[in-house]
Regions:
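Sequence/structural signature of beta-propeller modules
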Residues: 3-72, 346-359
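Beta-strand-rich domains and repeat architectures in extracellular enzymes and scaffolds
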Residues: 67-104
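Loop/turn-rich, solvent-exposed surfaces of beta-rich toroidal or solenoidal domains
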Residues: 250-311, 317
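A short helix->beta-strand "capping" segment at the edge of beta-propeller domains
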Residues: 49-78, 242-247, 307-315
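Repeated scaffold domains used in trafficking and secretory/extracellular systems
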Residues: 78-85, 128-136, 175-188, 254-261, ...
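Blade-level signature of beta-propeller repeat domains, shared across WD40, Kelch, NHL, RCC1
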Residues: 325-359
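Blade-loop segments of beta-propeller domains
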Residues: 75, 80-82, 105-107, 114-142
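Beta-propeller blade signature
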Residues: 104-114, 155-170, 207-234, 280-300, ...
Length: 359
């Protein structure tokens, strides 16, 4: 009887496993499509398992493939670096930070000397301190863009350059997007603004459910990155924007993306990280815009093509220290910052308080 019982248990488990695999595969045959509940639950379970194992299994800290260019300022003062860009017009690195108890700031670092030029304090339109996450910063040689939630702010580069060290800078112009912006980047033609996603039952990093897509037979995406033509939305910035700006195109992106930039050959670089004891990754994806869109989004004024950045589109990957954040390009190379040098992450497994160039 015991043997028979064990056989029934084994048979039941085998049937359930077979049905599960069949449902999982069949659910992805019609990709791209909205992610169904069954596959979403499996993906969320896998995400939680990944985070748990990544925190337990410690890989070597013998990292390669990066070269420090300059120190990241202000981390000794409680600021946490988030966004980063290289501004060619000023030949300076620009970094955005949040602070748990104070206003968010921007720092400029001279790219030639590596020395801090200034740090300015961000203020709201009404003059009160801006305490947003300031997750991304980008430039187009005329303006500096800063993102926080569904809003992208704009200040003139001239205003930043003429401001004195420690001075307040007002965020007087903004646009509203339909993505929860955690990072932004520019390539001279487009401004890219995208979402960070990892699953928690309390929904702390949730994104719009309409952004949850089955992008291939075996892959789901829960976040989106929009691309806005700089020439189209220049006049959309206002003190009190009333409508959501329509993107020119959009991309599905993987979980845990912290930075996004486009290379001169059209390829895309994404920084992926989460956790002070977990390796970061710098992924380079093929130029998916050379192919057909995966699907289209319908906006009131036009249909917008969406391209999927899938695992099969990765052309290179680089393992890096924990907490890689914003990235950009400089002289044809990807450069970026880490937040591990901030005081709140000093107990992480690898501290790197540097602006770095990557191979």
């Amino acid at each position: 009887m015991r043997l028979l019982g064990k056989r029934w248990i084994a048979l039941t488990l085998a049937v359930l496993l077979t049905v599960g695999i069949f449902a999982y595969v069949m659910g992805g045959i019609n990709a791209p499509s909205a992610a169904n509940r069954y596959r979403t639950t499996l993906a969320h379970g896998g995400e939680v398992l990944w985070r748990g194992l990544s925190g337990i299994v410690q890989r070597s800290t013998n990292y390669t493939g990066y070269t420090p260019l300059a120190d990241i300022p202000e981390t000794e003062n409680g600021y946490v670096p988030q966004g980063y860009c290289y501004c060619e017009a000023a030949d300076a690195y620009i970094i955005s930070y949040y602070h748990d108890k104070d206003a968010s700031v921007l720092s400029m670092v001279d790219a030639k000397t590596g020395k801090r030029q200034k740090t300015v304090v961000l203020h709201q339109n009404d003059g009160t301190p801006f305490t947003g996450h300031a997750g991304g910063v980008a430039d187009d040689d005329t303006y500096i863009y800063i993102c926080d939630g569904n809003t992208i702010y704009r200040i003139s580069l001239e205003r930043l350059q003429t401001a004195s060290d420690g001075a307040p800078v007002m965020l007087t112009e903004s646009i509203v997007t339909d993505v929860k912006c955690s990072y932004i980047g520019t390539d001279g033609e487009y401004l890219y603004a995208g979402e960070f996603y990892t699953y928690y039952s309390d929904g702390r990093y949730d994104t719009d459910p309409t952004h949850h897509m089955q992008v291939s037979t075996t892959e789901l995406s829960f976040a989106r990155c929009n691309a806005y033509a700089l020439s189209e939305f220049e006049n959309a910035f206002a003190e009190t924007p009333e409508t959501t700006v329509t993107p020119t195109m959009s991309f599905t992106v993987p979980n845990r993306v912290q930075g996004f930039t486009r290379l001169s050959d059209g390829q895309f670089a994404l920084s992926v990280s989460y956790g002070r004891n977990t390796d970061s990754w710098l992924y380079t994806y093929a130029d998916v815009t050379k192919g057909e869109p995966a699907y289209y989004l319908t906006y009131p004024d036009r249909d917008v093509p969406v391209y999927s950045l899938c695992r099969t589109d990765i052309v290179s990957r680089l393992r890096l220290p924990p907490l890689l954040e914003g990235i950009d390009t400089k002289d044809g190379k990807v450069t970026g910052i880490f937040e591990s040098g901030a005081e709140k992450y000093k107990n992480g497994k690898f501290i790197l308080n540097s602006i770095c160039e990557f191979e």
